[in-house]
UniProtKB/Swiss-Prot annotation:
Family: Belongs to the universal ribosomal protein uL2 family.
Alphabetical UniProt keywords: Ribonucleoprotein, Ribosomal protein, RNA-binding, rRNA-binding
Protein name, as recorded: Large ribosomal subunit protein uL2
Coiled coil regions in record: none
Domain of life from the UniProt record: Bacteria
Source organism: Parafrankia sp. (strain EAN1pec)
Protein purpose: One of the primary rRNA binding proteins. Required for association of the 30S and 50S subunits to form the 70S ribosome, for tRNA binding and peptide bond formation. It has been suggested to have peptidyltransferase activity; this is somewhat controversial. Makes several contacts with the 16S rRNA in the 70S ribosome.
Annotated GO CC locations: large ribosomal subunit
Example GO BP: cytoplasmic translation
Biased composition regions of type Basic residues, renumbered to the chain: 268-277
């Protein structure tokens, strides 16, 4: 993937950039692997906003991605590399020798015409999926399961990768992009390689309208609102809010205050955090 930068012909074009899409080989999805996707606009079943800053955007169709990679021993050919509006990564359409078609995340160095497979006997090359116990230490992987057979949960976005650093009994130790080292069951599957489209993070969107096309609405500061709309609202002239930062419902904002998760017991080393002085 490369990035094409625009000349400053308009204020919105100044500094903006776009992906060149040179790796894309087809401009329409496989019909049998597409489902309708209904926009919720951040509302729940009662019509109330539960997630702010969502709504609008271009209509999308959902591409069904194979995150389980459970078709063992059946080789597949990469028929196309396609664009997916629902994620930052590109997707690869696989044609299995038995006639089935599936989508997977397209890793780096996977091209149209390549062969991929999954299972214990698969080779260690980009796009192949194996249990962690069958992957050599030091290998870079993505699309990793947290529970055997549960489907990939870790390292699925563009440019994401995790390194297998050690194996100890029933667990494999993975180094996350954040620096965290976590134990994962060796029976869990992972795909060899790094997710493609790594330059995605370098795109300059240029104007608010491109964010609206993606379904992202503006984020308004609470101190710019009225008291009826936000706890920080109101006051004469410009104010600082007069209290510690809170969300519109009055709950503390900023640092997360999540309860302990059961999977935290599998963390070997925490990620490095910027500590306040």
């Amino acid at each position: 993937m490369g990035i094409r930068r625009y000349k400053p012909t308009t204020p919105g074009r100044r500094g903006s950039s776009v992906a060149d899409f040179v790796e894309i080989t087809r401009d329409h999805p496989e019909k049998s692997l597409v489902r309708p996707l209904h926009s919720k606009g951040g509302r729940n079943v009662h019509g109330r906003i539960t997630t702010r800053h969502q709504g609008g955007g271009h209509k999308r169709a959902y591409r069904i991605i194979d995150f389980r990679r459970d078709k063992d021993g059946v080789p597949a050919k990469v028929a196309h590399i396609e664009y997916d509006p629902n994620r930052t990564a590109r997707i690869a359409l696989l044609h299995y020798v038995d006639g089935e078609k599936r989508y997977i995340l397209a890793p780096v160095k996977l091209h149209q015409g390549d062969m991929v497979s999954s299972g214990v006997g698969a080779d260690i090359k980009p796009g192949n999926a194996l249990p962690l116990r069958n992957i050599p230490t030091g290998t870079v992987v993505h699309a990793i399961e947290l529970r055997p057979g549960g489907g990939a949960k870790i390292a699925r976005s563009a440019g994401a990768s995790v390194q297998l650093v050690a194996k100890d009994g029933p667990y494999a130790q993975l180094r996350m992009p954040s620096g965290e080292i976590r134990n994962v069951d060796v029976r869990c599957r992972a795909t060899v390689g790094e997710v493609g489209n790594a330059e995605q993070s370098n795109i300059n969107w240029g104007k608010a309208g491109r964010m609206r096309w993606k379904g992202r609405r503006p984020t308004v500061r609470g101190v710019a609102m009225n008291p009826v709309d936000h706890p920080h609202g109101g006051g004469e002239g410009k104010t600082s809010g007069g209290r510690h930062p809170v969300n519109p419902k009055g709950r503390p904002e900023g640092r997360t205050r999540r309860t302990k998760k059961s999977s935290d017991a599998l963390i070997v080393r925490r990620r490095k955090q910027n500590r306040r002085r």
